[in-house]
Amino acid sequence: MVKKVLLINGPNLNLLGTREPEKYGTTSLSDIEQAAIEQAKLKNNDSEVLVFQSNTEGFIIDRIHEAKRQGVGFVVINAGAYTHTSVGIRDALLGTAIPFIEVHITNVHQREPFRHQSYLSDKAVAVICGLGVYGYTAAIEYALNY
């Protein structure tokens, strides 16, 4: 059972709750993060969810590297737009060998064609998309039981 899970959110996800609510809903990133932290506490007192958000690719890569040093056992990542562009984030995840789940609030396959390509999916333990913010809950549950 994993004790430490890192929840990473990429660019523009800090705007959740106000950004295109018809697509992303009205739940804020802070609410998602707090729910994930509470979910871990309810699951097991020894478990914890660490949270991180950045609009900057390099900061996300640095945080993945730091996760390895911290003994993080699983990453849940919504890389946002970097999903479709970042070889660097892919390489950081592979380089640290921390298992991960890719999460998207919307069903990216029902959106613009450029969103159909993911640099992460083929290496992810699982991909969750289109379940709204519940996708985070499902991913955290899986990660804590990994």
Swiss-Prot record:
Which EC number(s) does the record attach to this protein?
4.2.1.10
Q: Which residues form a coiled coil?
A: none
Keyword Lyase assigned: yes
| Entry annotated with the keyword Iron-sulfur | no
User: Its pathway?
Assistant: Aromatic compound metabolism; 3,4-dihydroxybenzoate biosynthesis; 3,4-dihydroxybenzoate from 3-dehydroquinate: step 1/2
Which Pfam family, just one, is annotated for this protein? DHquinase_II
Sequence positions that bind substrate = 78, 84, 91, 105-106, 115
What InterPro entries does the record point to?
A: DHquinase_II, DHquinase_II_CS, DHquinase_II_sf
GO BP terms: 3,4-dihydroxybenzoate biosynthetic process; quinate catabolic process
Q: Which UniProt keywords apply?
A: Lyase, Quinate metabolism
| PROSITE patterns membership | DEHYDROQUINASE_II (PS01029)
The record's listing under PANTHER family reads:
CATABOLIC 3-DEHYDROQUINASE
> What is the recorded function of this protein according to its Swiss-Prot or TrEMBL entry?
Is involved in the catabolism of quinate. Allows the utilization of quinate as carbon source via the beta-ketoadipate pathway.
> Of which family is this protein a member?
Belongs to the type-II 3-dehydroquinase family.
What name does UniProt use for this protein?
A: Catabolic 3-dehydroquinase
Organism of provenance: Candida albicans (strain SC5314 / ATCC MYA-2876)
